[in-house]
C-alpha cells in the first residue's frame, strides 16, 4: 500500500510540473502570425519518432493556405516514406489577436490555438488510422518561427496522458 501511495504521489508531482505556455514567448521576436505564414505555399519535411525516440516514419508535405480576413483554409498533402499519401484540410478561425479555433475531418471536436511572439500552440485530438481502426491521439503541437521563411514544429502525441510518439517538422515558405 505504501508503494502505491508513493507512486501516486510521484505521478501527481510530475503532473504538477511547470509546462511551457504560449505566453512564455509573448515578448520574443520574430512574431508568428499563423494566418500570414501559412498563406500561400509552404513545404515541410518531418520525422515521426516512437515513444523511445526511434524514427519510425518520415514525410515530405506540401501546404497551401488561403486567408480571407477571418479564417484560414489550409490544405495539407503528406507523402510518407512508406508510400502512404495523406491529405487534410484545416479551417482555422481567428478569434482575437492570440486565440484560434480549428477543425478538420479527422479532428475530434475543435482544435484550440494560441499565438504569442514566435510561438503557436495547437491542441487537438486526431483520429489516427492504425491497423484498420481509427484511434484518438491527443496532440500538443508547437510551431516556432525562426525567420520569415522557416518555422520548426514539435508535436507530442499522447494516449491516456502517456506519450506515444513525437513529430518534428521543418517548414519553409515559398
Residue locations for each model-derived region?
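Sec-dependent signal peptide recognition
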Residues: 2-7
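C-terminal motif of bacterial Sec signal peptides marking the signal peptidase cleavage site
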Residues: 14-15
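Sequence-level preference for short, compositionally simple segments enriched
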Residues: 19-23, 48, 67, 141, ...
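N-terminal helix-cap/turn-to-beta initiation motif at the start of protein domains
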Residues: 25-41
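A short, Trp-centered hydrophobic/proline-enriched beta-strand micro-motif
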Residues: 38-46, 153
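Central antiparallel beta-sheet cores of small beta-barrel/beta-sandwich binding domains
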Residues: 45, 49-130
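Amphipathic hydrophobic-ligand
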Residues: 55-61, 134-139, 163-165
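Glycine-rich, aromatic-bearing surface loops/beta-hairpins
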Residues: 140-174
